[in-house]
Curated annotation (Swiss-Prot):
Spans traversing the lipid bilayer: none
SUPFAM superfamilies in alphabetical order: Sigma3 and sigma4 domains of RNA polymerase sigma factors (SSF88659)
Entry protein name: UPF0122 protein YofM
Function: Might take part in the signal recognition particle (SRP) pathway. This is inferred from the conservation of its genetic proximity to ftsY/ffh. May be a regulatory protein.
Gene3D superfamilies in the record: Winged helix-like DNA-binding domain superfamily/Winged helix DNA-binding domain (1.10.10.10)
The organism's place on the tree of life at top rank: Bacteria
Length: 111
C-alpha cells in the first residue's frame, strides 16, 4: 500500500468520517489507520475478503467525491500555508502573530 495514498485516505477520513456509514467507517479505519489486512477485516466481520475490498474501494471513491465537492482538506492546506506565510512575513508584529495562531488553533480543533 502506498504511503501517500494511506496518508491521504487517513486525512480524508478525518475530515469526512461523520458522513460515512458505520460499516464504511469501520472498514476504512481498520484498513488504513490500524493497518489491518483484508483477510483480518473479513474475519472480524465474518464476510469475504472480496466484500471488504469492494466496500473499501467504494468508500475511497466516496471520500474523494466529498473532497471534490466540499474541498475541506484542500482549503485546510491552503489556509495553513497562508497562515505560515503571514507569520513569517510579520514575525515582529506580536499582536498579529497571536491572532494568526488563534486562527490556526481553531482550525486544528475542528479536525
Amino acid at each position: 500500500m502506498e504511503i501517500e495514498k494511506t496518508n491521504r485516505m487517513n486525512t480524508l477520513f478525518e475530515f469526512y468520517a461523520t458522513l460515512l456509514t458505520d460499516k464504511q467507517m469501520n472498514y476504512i479505519e481498520l484498513y488504513y489507520a490500524d493497518d489491518y489486512s483484508l483477510a483480518e477485516i473479513a474475519e472480524e466481520f465474518n464476510i469475504s475478503r472480496q466484500a471488504v475490498y469492494d466496500n473499501i474501494k467504494r468508500t475511497e471513491k466516496v471520500l474523494e467525491s466529498y473532497e471534490e465537492k466540499l474541498h475541506l482538506f484542500s482549503n485546510y492546506v491552503v489556509r495553513n500555508q497562508l497562515l505560515e506565510e503571514l507569520m513569517k512575513k510579520y514575525s515582529t508584529d506580536q499582536y498579529l502573530i497571536t491572532k494568526l495562531q488563534e486562527i490556526q488553533q481553531i482550525d486544528e480543533e475542528e479536525f
